[in-house]
Amino acid sequence: MPTSSISFVSPANHARAHSSRRIAWWLFAAFQFFYLLTSTGRVRTPDEYNTLYTTESLVLRGSTAVPQAVELHNFYGRYDLHNRPRAAYPPGQALLCIPWYAFGQYLLARLPGVPADDADLVVAFSSCLSSATFSALTVAFFFLFLVGIGIPARASLFAAAMVGLGTPIFAYSGWLFSEPLSAAIFVGVALLLFGRGHAPIAWRSASIAGLVLGLATLVRPTNALAIPVFALAVLVRDGKPALRAAFILCATSAIGVLALLAHNALLFGGPFEFGYPTAAESAKRLNTFDTPLVKGLYGFLLSPGKSIFVFAPPLILALAGLRRLWKLERGAATMATLLPLVYLFFFARYTQWEGGYCVGPRYMVPSIVLLCLALGPMLAGNAAPFSAARTNAARIKKIALLLLVLGALVQCVSLATSFMEDQVPRGRYYDANWTYRLSYSLSGQIHLLWKYLASGEPARLGLGWDRWFVFLHKGGVSAATLAVVGLIMLAGLGISVAGLARNGRCAS
């Protein structure tokens, strides 16, 4: 009897896993093409520019020094021991952006209809598309995780759509910040550790997870906050037998952390000497922790311009699902609860907690995605007490749909026009002392949206509709070339959505 049972169940599980992987591939492709179409394709902040400059230096000069940033009066970083300018952030994101930069430099910039003077615009556009890929990868990993812990495919797809459309992962897919990459790393590690069944975590999985988390500090040093949280989640999940896996995770993560510290020591003279400048506008010190905790918490939770609930409405339902997630997968529930809390209290004290010029709670974006993992159990509708009544399950889905629509509207407003056009005028986003104004809200971007909807006059380059095809056309790229690129993206989106629908029906 046991033998026949095993031989029957195993092929079914294998077929289910294979079907889920197919759906994930189509889901990734659909969001990839969707994010490509909706991308701004522009870099505008010092953070984005200096990542682009580092990538450019790596491709063209084999160096991470950014002399071009100094020449263009757009340098944000420090001079190293040899008096060479270095960007503020480690080179992790820049290294991973190399394929997109090279694609723009050696292919897109040489297309017919692209003037030689516009090569820099086209290369920046191509580099920015890396965020679309990282965001799409986040959504695909998110879906695979939920299926892996037993959530039905349809509910997992719905939850993935809520994250991909209703949270800042959508908005940040259009800019060159590091948050989409960090989110993809965290969800990918969660999938590796907790999304592949209830068996104890193997040492190989723990070692790979630790290595990836350690190397993630080369993308952003604060990603180190995730290492102890994931290790603790492993212990909570499997108890004392998981001590070895937790230790291996921490030990292998040390490889990436040591690489970061060695990078700092070689360039700046000390392991804890990072590339951040000591001060920015008006000599204001940015990288300290002098924000009152209450102010930072208010900003992230309740302020109109940075609240996680304003910019990620699905979190409201996710919070209600944490208990269900705990019943399904304790390690995931621990991680989904603790990492957002760690990020919240850490960045609430950070001087520049608002994230500089940006949309919404930038620093919270990767942890927001992890908290949204609790959406899956809520949408599955198979846990007490809600499963006892279909009306309750239907009500939850209606609430989820409403939150998805609200979140998508917020992201669309955020992406429609350049946030810099709204935030740069003095007194709107920052006060005279370069302190973030807690009264700031999306009302300015909503006003810009209506302004450009009502106006038939084309805006200057960098203003108006913040879409790649708009600003590239203003820059001189021919309409025919842009139409061909856009049609390829539209065709890819259509094929991907059709494939996703077909495979989704089969799975259901």
Task: Annotate each predicted stretch with a short phrase.
Residues 1-508:
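Membrane-proximal envelope and lipid/glycan-remodeling enzymes
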